[in-house]
Amino acid sequence: MRPKDQVQSSAGDGTGSGDPATGTPTTQPAADPAPEPSAEPKPAPAQGTGSGQKSGSRTKTGGSFCRSRIRGDSDAPWTRYIFQGPYGPRATGLGTGRAEGIWKTPAAYIGRRPGVSGPERAAFIRELQEALCPNPLPRKKITEDDIKVMLYLLEEKERDLNTAARIGQSLVKQNSVLMEENNKLETMLGSAREEILHLRKQVNLRDDLLQLYSDSDDDEEDEEDEEEEEGEEEEREGQRDQDQQHDHPYGAPKPPPKAETLHHCPQLEALKQKLKLLEEENDHLREEASHLDNLEDKEQMLILECVEQFSEASQQMAELSEVLVLRLEGYERQQKEITQLQAEITKLQQRCQSYGAQTEKLQQQLASEKGVHPESLRAGSHMQDYGSRPRERQEDGKSHRQRSSMPAGSVTHYGYSVPLDALPSFPETLAEELRTSLRKFITDPAYFMERCDTRCREERKKEQGTMPPPPVQDLKPPEDFEAPEELVPEEELGAIEEVGTAEDGPAEETEQASEETEAWEEVEPEVDEATRMNVVVSALEASGLGPSHLDMKYVLQQLSNWQDAHSKRQQKQKVVPKDSPAPQQQTNMGGGIVEQQPIVPTQDSQRLEEDRATHSPSAREEEGPSGAT
C-alpha cells in the first residue's frame, strides 16, 4: 500500500470548526500516486487555537471533513474526503460501495473536461450531496407566531427605515442650509480679506510716508546741525586768518578753502516732489471746495427763491380755486336758469304751435267769412230798400198800436206774417246778418240805462204799496226752462199767430212793414264783445234752436217787436222831459219776456262794414259755439 498523508482540518478560525466548508486541504506529496480506498477517518482536533468554548461546543454537534489529494497517473489531482463528526456508524457509507466511485472520479477533471455535459455534472453533484449527507436533518415547520414575529420585525425595520429617511431628509435640508450659510460666509470672508488687503496696503503706504517724513526731518536736523558747525568753523578760520594776517601782514599764504560736504538723498528729492504734488492737489482741492461752497450758496438762494415762488403759486392756486368755485356756482345757477328757460321755451313753442293752429283755423274762417260778407251786404242793402217806404204808414201804425195797447204789466203778442216771396233768398248769410244785428241792437248802452230806470221805478212802486210784475234780470233762462217751440208744435204756433194777425187787421200789416224798415235803418249799435255773446246766447237758448235751425219767422217777429218798442219810446220821449228815464216796455220774444231799450241813431252801411272789419276772428269763433248752446 502507498503511504497517505492526511490533512486534518484546523478549527483555529473564529467562526468554528464544525462547518464542513472550514476544512483546509493539504497537498499530498508526489510519492503517493493514488488514495487508499479503505482509509479510516482519524479523529481531528476539534478546537482551534483561536476559538474558545463556543467553537468547542460546535465541534460536538457538527462534523468536520478532512481532504487529501493524491497525485496519480491522470493530469487532474484526485481528492479524497474524510468525514469526521458525531454521526458514528452512519458515516461509514462514505468509504464503501457507492462512494468508491465518487472518491475515484476526478471531480476537477469532470469540471474541466469539455465532453462532460450539464446533466452529467448535475447528476454528479446530486450524488455528491447524497454521499455527503445521507441522512439530512428534518425541516422545521414555520408557525404563525414565527410569521407574526417576522412581520413585526419587518415593520420595525420599515419604521427604522422611515425614521432614517426622515432624519436623512432633515439632515439634507440642514446641510443645504448650512451650505448656503457657508457660501455666504465664504463670500463675506473673501470680501473681508480683500478689505484687509486694501487696508494693509493703505497702512503700508502710510507707514512709508511717515517713515519718509521722519527721515526727511532727521536729515534736515542733521543738515542744520552740520551747517551750524560749518558756520562756526568758518568763523573760527576767519578769526585765525585775521590773526595770521596780523602776524604776517604781507605775503602770507592763504590756506585753501575746504570743500563743502554735499549730502545726496534720493528719497528726500522724491518726497519733495511728492510734497509739491500734494500741495498742488491741495490747492486745487481748496479751489474746488471754494467753488462748491459758492455753488451751494447759489443753490440755497435758488431754493429760497423757488420756495417763495412756490408760496406765491400756492396763493394764486388758492385764489384761482376760490374763483373756480364761484364760477362753478355761477355755472350751476346758469344751468338751472338755462333749464328753466328751456322749459319756458318749450312751453312757448307749444303755445306758438297752438296759436299757429288757431291762426290757421281763424284765417280759414276769415276767408270763409270774407266770402260770406258781400252776400250779407247785398242782403242789408235789400233790407234797406224797405226803409224807403213812407213815414206815414209808420205813424199810422203807431197810432193804431197806441189805441189797441194793453194795460201796464201785460204782455203783448204780435203775430206778423211777412211774405217770404219779398225776399230774394233765405241763405245762411241772412241768418248770420240777422244775428249780428240782433247783438248790436240788444247790447246798446241805453238798454242798461233803461234797466236801471226800471229798478228805480219798481222801488218807488214798492214804497207806494203797488207791486209791479217782476222784471227779467238775466237774459239767460233757468235750467228747467223749455222753449215754447218745444212745448207747442210749430203748426199750432203758426195758427195762433195767424189768429192774432186776423184780429189786428190790415192796419197792423202796414205798421209791421214800416217798423221793419225803420228797424233796419236804426239797428247799428257799438257793443262790447262779451255783452254781445251773452245776449246772443240768451236769445238762442230762449228760442231753443241752434244757429243752423234759426227760424226766419221767429227772427222777423222779434224784429217787429223791437221796432214797436222803439216807436213807443220815441213817442214817450216827446211827452216826457229829457231828464226823466224812459219807460219800460215788455214784449214777447217767442215765449220769453225781454226788456227793450232806446235805439242809437242809424248809420250807413260803410260804418257797418268797418265795424265788422274791426272785430277779431277769435270773437267770431267764440260766438259760433256760444250760439249753438
Swiss-Prot record:
Q: Name one GO biological process term.
A: regulation of organelle transport along microtubule
Biased composition, Polar residues: where in the chain? 1-12, 52-62
Q: Which residues form a coiled coil?
A: 169-300, 328-369
Compositional bias (Acidic residues) spans? 215-236, 480-495, 505-528
Ribonucleoprotein as a keyword of this entry, yes or no, is no
| Compartments it resides in | Cytoplasm; Presynapse; Cytoplasm, Cytoskeleton; Cell projection, Dendritic spine
Name the tissues where it is expressed. Answer: In the brain, especially in the olfactory bulb and in the brain stem. No detectable expression in peripheral tissues such as lung, testis, spleen, and small intestine.
Map out region (Interaction with TBP) in residue numbers.
158-262, 474-583
Q: Which GO terms describe its cellular component?
A: autophagosome; axon cytoplasm; axon terminus; centriole; centrosome; cytoplasm; cytoplasmic vesicle; dendrite
Would you say which domain of life the source belongs to? Eukaryota
Does the UniProt entry include the keyword Chaperone? Answer: no
The molecular function GO annotations come to: brain-derived neurotrophic factor binding; identical protein binding; myosin binding; protein domain specific binding; signaling receptor binding; transmembrane transporter binding
What are the alphabetically sorted keywords of the record? Autophagy, Cell projection, Cilium biogenesis/degradation, Coiled coil, Cytoplasm, Cytoplasmic vesicle, Cytoskeleton, Endoplasmic reticulum, Endosome, Exocytosis, Lysosome, Mitochondrion, Nucleus, Phosphoprotein, Protein transport, Synapse, Transport
- Where the record annotates domain HAP1 N-terminal, the positions are 80-404
**Region (Sufficient for self-association and interaction with HD) spans which residues?**
277-445
Here the segments flagged for biased composition (Pro residues) are: 32-44
| Function description | Originally identified as neuronal protein that specifically associates with HTT/huntingtin and the binding is enhanced by an expanded polyglutamine repeat within HTT possibly affecting HAP1 interaction properties. Both HTT and HAP1 are involved in intracellular trafficking and HAP1 is proposed to link HTT to motor proteins and/or transport cargos. Seems to play a role in vesicular transport within neurons and axons such as from early endosomes to late endocytic compartments and to promote neurite outgrowth.
Q: What is this protein called?
A: Huntingtin-associated protein 1
Q: Per UniProt, what is the name of the gene that codes for the protein in this document?
A: Hap1
